[in-house]
Amino acid sequence: MKQVLLACFGIWFLSTGAARALAQPSAQQKVIIDTDIGDDIDDAFAVGLALSSPELKILGITSAWGDTELRSRMVDRLLCETGRSDIPVKTGIKTASKATFSQEAWARAGKLRSHGDAVEFMLEQIRKNPGEITLIAIAPLTNIGAAIDRDPGTLKKLKRVVLMGGSVRRGYDEFGLAVARPPEAEYNMAMDPAAAQKLFGFGVPVYMMPLDSTQLKLDEVRRAMLSTVSTPLTDSLQVLTAEWQRMTHQTTPTMFDVVAVAYAVNPELCPATPLHIEVDDAGNTRERPGDANVHVCLNSDSDRFFQFLMPRLLEQKLHGDSVCVAP
């Protein structure tokens, strides 16, 4: 079975032109990733894609929402496993969270380290690199809202924010339903609508990947591809997926946050339309008349997305040389 999957992947990889794209990265862009890794599984895949993308120079990864210290510990372990402990990890504002930390066991097995303040780290990096940093926000926007409050002049010097969040013309998909649900309050927006309101009215360029374009399913065939290779990243993603499945009783991961990272690397994967979006107090993101304040990707091509994602995860050579678990 493994040989069949490898052969199928090789034919698909070469025929799609993905190999050529992977071999010819564009100039690096500086990014900071703000993530609530550990609840849903898509954050781990999003960080994995970022680590596998030579187009990105990751200045740091910041944890957001809920138990942010444990999230930082999880990021530490993932970076250690993949040989990227050179990337700074900072801890964001801790909040109450009702979401299940589905990958807690894997996170707690990592080494305990100290971390600095995520908000101050963001601001320091922007001061050092004005107009150059893309902030990839794949979590509730609490850290960004705090940065606006703390030093709005500095945050104005972001190049752009690429975020996963919102629901403009369709809501969450449900298996078995022929028609998508109507727009609704998406999780990242609903958890901290005040922070989202601050960002959407702030004036920095915002590129939004809502539910409309991010509900792409990592089906069983593609999940099986991860078992055709054995690298620290693919092994970690398989273990984390199994933990997520066990804790949530779900089977098929949805790549919500991965779309935001993919867009940062290649905007052609999710063409964005300028719209005027208002965030209400419940976190609904309403399309309204008026001057555009956000660029929104309303549709994505699932096949094209996975033709981009899977080769990067399967062909990366990331490898750590340290013991990454606590004794």
Question: For each predicted feature, which ranges?
Answer:
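Short, well-ordered secondary-structure micro-motifs
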Residues: 100-102, 172-175, 219-221
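Metal-dependent C-N hydrolase catalytic cores
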Residues: 27-28, 33, 69-128, 133-134, ...
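Sec-dependent N-terminal signal peptides
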Residues: 4-12
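Active-site histidine-anchored catalytic micro-motif
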Residues: 25-35, 41-73, 110-208, 212-214
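C-terminal segment of classical bacterial N-terminal signal peptides
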Residues: 12-20
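Conformational coupling and interaction surfaces
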Residues: 25-28, 45-52, 187-190, 194-327
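Short glycine/threonine-rich catalytic loop with a Thr-x-Gly-x-Asp
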Residues: 38-39, 254
